[in-house]
Every structure is written in structure tokens, then in C-alpha cells.
Design a protein with these regions (language model features):
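N-terminal secretory signal peptides that target proteins for export/translocation
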Residues: 1-16
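Intrinsically disordered, low-complexity regions enriched in small/polar residues
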Residues: 9-12, 23, 126
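Bacterial N-terminal signal peptides
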Residues: 17-31
Length: 465
């Protein structure tokens, strides 16, 4: 899975006072008004225009109240913290079908996947035809940031609607989805307008006090940015989390948002003298597992590693705003990517949004493995209910289609740069390549699989510890 960022840099001629200006033009997409993530939230209006908004409960009073209410409402079993909770996906679908037929609502324990906070294993049991995912789990509650998180760890729990989106992307009758992506791109006309705006600035006697005017000039030149989502419906929560993560990562990169952990931003490292004219820095997230281990019979998989890393490359912008990859990346971008990757898990503990993104990667890789090994066919599971939008709707939100650029102004050295960017690119099959997918010859995964028992499950039970 991967998230793409693009930064567009121009070198200026020196100005009279040899003072330079770095205008960081940032674009991104994010989630719909009724859903909030991370440390704040977002809005998408009927025209598809994205806008970020903050939701803060500095006192913690609301969190404590909601935690107390959830503690009283949830049953004792699901509130238990478990290192290894199991969820049978096809049993869960069968139970949901019964509830739907009886006119009953989706229960919280199903909506939030029995409190799973990660997927660490996928198992298939030929005897019972169960397709099982497993991982750590705990009781959950809706916190003041409108994130459903664990009662003990504060980690976001998996959402069934996101899992369904992943399963549909790698379903029993579908071709493997090559990429799940969100891109936020300046238009060609916008890039041409920006080049003209830069030329105007080069012809002027630029002063420090003109920074606000320059920001306005660039914002107007760039215009609205186009948002494109591929691989999943843009009207899903899955898509909204992807693009929201992209948006906030970019804010950190250009210095408009301070991360809750120490991350060296792009502008911390940027040296304008080495940023090539008309260059774009493209950043994107992808799976970061040390190994994806499988059992010798390929009926079990373990995800081992952090889950997410940030990588990138440079592009060049030619006439007419046409972009072409160079296969290279400057030192500032390399430093930012390495720092972000190194601190990702620490960041995810502080900011639920990045843990949400990691969960999407876990779910996508799990779904791709299920499809790759044809567990659907082996289990005789056609995803009949979860795969049907009329029976289990997930396309419920306004689709983000455009966003205005956000501009940051930073003085740096003798040069003038305008980085621009945007995008998300998730490639779960990258985690299933021969260089990362290893056969487990220690027996560890097989042992974990055999430890799962079905004999004591009650009728309709689809999760257990």
C-alpha cells in the first residue's frame, strides 16, 4: 500500500536583499463530514470540496464519560483484552444475514470486528470451511475525536465496513485489484499558471513583507486540485481514511502541522540549492512487513512487521504541466521518508489516523492473500451478502473530488521553492511477492493455527479468544 506526495520546486534568482522565500503549496483529500479521524475531522460538501476541521477535548472529560458508558454497555467477554482473538469472516457474514432477515440492526461487536486492533494472522480450515483472521483485541468506545478505540490501549479498532471494502477489492469473482489509490493533482493549467506566477515574482523586487501576497498569488495560480480515487469506491470510509492520512502527512511534511512525535519534515531538511528546477517529490506509503510468513501448506499467514513505510521519487515537470518520473529523490525527501517510516508506529500510537491507515493495509493484504490462495473457492464462500451493496452498503459518503491548496511560507537561504503534492497508493500484493513472503519452517504459524478450536462455539458465534 502506498501514499503519493508531490512537491514542485522552482529555484529563483536572488532578490535584492538575497532573502528567499519557500512557499509550500500543499493539497490533499479527506473524509466526509459525518466521520472524523485522527486528532480532528474533515468535511466534504455536496460538490466534493474537502475542508479540514479540528475536534479537541483538551480536558479529557468527554473521553472519561464515554469510556464509562461503554464499559457498562459492552458484555464482559468482548471487553476482555486478548492477545489473539479470532474472527471467522464467513461465519460472521452468515450471522449478519440472519440478523438482517430478522430486521435487527448491526450490533457493535460486529460493526467493530470484535474489538480487533490489528490483523496478524489469516487461517483457512478445510474441515470446517472457516476463513479466520486473528490479532490483538479489546473492548472499545467512541472517544472525543469520534474515533472508536480500544479501552486499554486507545488503538483504533477494525471496522467491518472497511474489511468489506477490502474483501470486495479482492473478492471471489473479481480480478486482483492492482492498486488502491488516491491522487491529488494540480491541473496542467494550474502548473502553467504557477510557472507564470513564479516568473512574475522573479521580475519583482521581492521583500519579506510580501510573503502573504505571494502565498495568495500562488494559491490563485494553482486553483483547485483534482482528487482521484481508484481501486475502491470514493464514497467509502476506506477511501476517506486513505485520503485523510495523505492530507495530514503532507501537513507534517511541509511544516503546517506538528507531529505528536519527532519527525524530520521535508522543510527541516530542504536545501534549496539542491532542489532542481521544475522537480516534484513524490511520496507514497506502501506495506512494510519484515516478512509475510506462510505455512508450508499455504493455509495460514502471519504478518510480521510495522505495516507501513513512506517512500518516494522525484519527477520533472515539462511544458504544459506534463510530469515524468526520474527515479531519484533529493536528500530532504529521503530524510523525511526515513524519519516518517522510523517513527510511524510511535506516531500511530499518538494519532489514531495513522493506525487506521495501517489497519487498511493489514486488511488489504489479508484480503489479497485470501483471494490469491482461493480460500473463497475452497470454502464455497461467494461473499453473497457482504459483496452486495444493497444488502451491506458501504458507499455512504460524499466523494472527495477537489481541494484548494494550502500554503506554508518559510524563509530559507537564497532560493525560492514551491512544493506541491498529493496522493495515496496502496499495493497490498507487494507484500505477497517472493522476496517478502517466506515459508515458515519453524512450525510457529502451524502451531498458532492448530490452537484455534471450533468445538465449543455456540450457534451463531463467529468470534472467540
Amino acid at each position: 500500500m502506498s501514499i503519493q506526495k508531490q512537491f514542485f520546486g522552482y529555484q529563483s534568482l536572488g532578490f535584492l536583499k538575497r532573502v528567499t522565500f519557500m512557499a509550500m503549496a500543499m493539497v490533499a483529500c479527506s473524509s466526509v463530514a459525518s466521520v472524523t479521524f485522527g486528532q480532528g475531522g474533515v468535511e466534504i460538501d455536496a460538490k466534493g470540496v474537502f475542508q479540514s476541521r479540528a475536534l479537541i477535548d483538551g480536558s479529557g472529560v468527554l473521553d472519561r464519560q464515554r469510556l464509562k458508558a461503554a464499559d457498562a454497555a459492552l458484555n464482559a467477554d468482548i471487553k476482555k483484552q486478548s492477545k489473539f482473538r479470532k474472527v471467522s469472516l464467513n461465519r460472521m457474514e452468515a450471522e449478519f444475514a440472519k440478523l438482517k432477515k430478522a430486521g435487527k440492526p448491526l450490533p457493535p461487536e460486529m460493526e467493530y470486528m470484535a474489538g480487533l486492533t490489528r490483523i496478524t494472522h489469516v487461517f483457512f480450515y478445510p474441515e470446517s470451511k472457516d476463513i479466520v483472521i486473528a490479532g490483538p483485541a479489546e473492548g472499545f468506545f467512541l472517544n472525543s475525536g469520534n474515533n472508536v478505540v480500544g479501552m486499554k490501549t486507545g488503538a483504533p479498532v477494525l471496522k467491518l465496513e472497511d474489511m468489506v471494502v477490502a474483501l470486495r477489492s479482492y473478492g471471489p469473482d473479481a480480478k486482483a485489484t492492482k492498486v488502491i489509490s488516491c491522487s491529488i493533482d494540480p491541473t496542467r493549467q494550474g502548473l502553467q499558471n504557477l510557472k507564470q506566477a513564479v516568473s512574475q515574482m522573479q521580475a519583482r523586487n521581492f521583500q519579506a513583507g510580501d510573503a502573504a501576497a505571494v502565498v495568495d498569488l500562488f494559491r490563485n495560480a494553482l486553483g483547485m486540485q483534482k482528487i482521484t480515487v481508484k481501486g475502491v469506491s470514493p464514497q467509502t470510509r476506506f477511501a476517506q481514511v486513505m485520503v485523510d492520512a495523505d492530507y495530514h502527512m503532507k501537513l507534517i511534511g511541509i511544516g503546517l502541522e506538528r507531529a505528536p512525535v519527532r519527525i524530520d519534515s521535508f522543510i527541516d531538511k530542504a536545501s534549496p540549492t539542491v532542489v532542481a528546477k521544475n522537480s516534484l517529490q513524490r511520496w507514497y506509503f506502501q506495506p512494510d512487513y519484515d516478512y509475510v510468513r506462510v505455512s508450508p501448506d499455504e493455509t495460514a499467514m502471519e504478518l510480521d512487521g510495522g505495516g507501513v513505510k513512506l517512500v518516494g521519487e522525484s519527477e520533472r515537470v515539462g511544458n504544459g504541466g506534463v510530469r515524468k518520473g526520474t527515479g531519484k529523490m533529493n536528500r530532504a525527501s529521503t530524510g523525511f521518508c526515513r524519519s516518517f517510516t522510523k517513527m510511524y508506529n510511535a506516531l500511530a500510537k499518538k494519532s489514531p489516523l495513522y493506525a487506521e491507515l495501517r489497519n487498511l493495509i493489514d486488511m488489504s493484504v489479508a484480503a489479497a492473500f485470501i483471494q490469491e490462495m482461493d480460500f473463497y473457492g475452497e470454502a464455497g464462500w461467494g461473499l453473497e451478502v457482504f459483496g452486495d451493496e444493497s444488502q451491506f452498503p458501504v458507499e455512504k459518503y460524499n466523494a472527495p473530488t477537489q481541494v484548494a491548496p494550502a500554503i506554508n511560507a518559510v524563509w530559507k537561504g537564497q532560493y525560492f521553492m514551491t512544493p506541491i503534492g498529493g496522493g495515496v497508493n496502496i499495493q497490498p500484493q507487494a507484500a505477497l511477492q517472493p522476496d517478502t513472503m517466506k515459508v515458515d519452517d519453524t512450525g510457529k504459524i502451524e502451531k498458532a493455527k492448530k490452537a484455534v478450536e471450533f468445538k465449543d462455539l455456540a450457534d451463531g458465534q463467529w468470534w472467540w479468544d
